[in-house]
A protein has these predicted regions:
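Short loop/turn segments at secondary-structure transitions that flank enzyme active sites
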Residues: 185, 209, 240, 255, ...
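Extracellular acidic loop/turn motifs
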Residues: 29-30, 239-242, 289-292
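Contiguous beta-strand segments within globular domains
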Residues: 211-248, 252-253, 279-283
Length: 305
């Protein structure tokens, strides 16, 4: 009722009208299978290209189906990001079904209580590797949602509105802080329980190419290109500072000659490896070790001006 006792006038904006389809997801396995999620918590599926629909809504309080993700690995598996922030419930809700929505289960913990989830995506190469965009940043899971870990790094603490796994990168859309791209998901795809039990693990090294770059530089804002040299990524755990073990990485030619060497006991800062616990990236630009001049030979000197 309005203030004077009469009916409320519908202003026609539609904001007070619920039951609006909010998200539609077509299965990558079949164009006939389509999911539709609404802003009142209902989820429907069609398996005949839209000729008929079936209600597969999870038994939850009224909320919004913010995104739907059909697994790129299993046609019967689907994830939904569900939220109730409009009801002052800011808890994170991620649900999974392995039978086309006939039954649902809530995925695990690890996401902050007040970080409601806007989007969830599964990695296109590694099954069970999930990424979740929340109101306060990004989380990832390596065990198909049983546990979640915050994965913020240098990304601003900002609402994540969408995520896309594009080839080997994760593209992030934020609310108010532009687009961000995480280059090279390879270490996450290699990560496993077996690796976690090892004190040291070296990830697969990609092929690299040495190129000559122009001295001319474009002006203005631009994206940052990947490192043009060779990157060696490795993981260390249970590091004892008193341990005398030396960590050494050598780059060698086809005839097994050492081109460049790095070690944890090097006296040269540019050749020294940090042995702190965690993930590390060693970069080699293709330059080789210098040589020592014979005694009595002086290097050339010159000036320009």
């Amino acid at each position: 009722m309005g203030p004077g006792g009469g009916p409320i006038t519908n202003e026609g904006a539609g904001g007070e009208v619920y039951h609006t389809i909010y998200y539609i997801a077509e299965s990558p396995h079949s164009k006939e299978v389509i999911y539709a999620g609404a802003d009142d918590g209902l989820v429907h599926i069609t398996t005949d290209g839209g000729n008929s629909w079936k209600n597969i809504s999870p038994k939850l309080e009224e909320g919004m189906i913010n995104s739907i993700e059909v697994s790129p690995h299993n046609p019967s598996t689907v994830y939904i990001a569900y939220n109730r922030y409009k009801f002052d419930d800011f808890k994170p809700y991620i649900l999974k079904s392995t039978d086309y929505g006939s039954s649902w289960k809530m995925l695990g913990t690890g996401i902050e209580e007040n970080s409601f989830v806007r989007v969830v995506r599964e990695d296109i190469e590694k099954e069970g590797l999930l990424y979740a965009g929340t109101e306060r940043g990004i989380y990832m899971s390596i065990d198909d949602g049983i546990s979640w870990h915050k994965w913020q790094r240098n990304l601003p603490v900002v609402p994540i509105t969408d995520l896309v796994v594009h080839k080997n990168d994760l593209v992030v859309a934020t609310q108010g802080r532009s687009f961000w791209i995480l280059d090279d998901l390879s270490p996450l795809r290699e990560y496993s329980d077996e690796m976690r039990s090892k004190n040291i693990h070296m990830f697969d090294v990609k092929d690299s190419h040495k190129v000559l770059r122009s001295a001319m530089r474009r002006q203005g804002p631009m994206g940052k290109n990947p490192y043009y040299g060779t990157e060696v990524k490795f993981f260390l755990r249970d590091i004892d500072e008193e341990d005398s073990t030396v960590l050494k990485v050598e780059f060698m030619s086809e005839d097994m000659k050492v081109l460049r060497s790095y070690s944890s006991d090097s006296e040269l800062r540019q050749n020294k490896i940090d042995i702190a616990e965690g993930f590390h990236t060693l970069r080699w630009g293709g330059n080789v070790e210098g040589f020592e001049l014979p005694k009595g030979v002086m290097p050339p000197r010159g000036s320009q001006g």
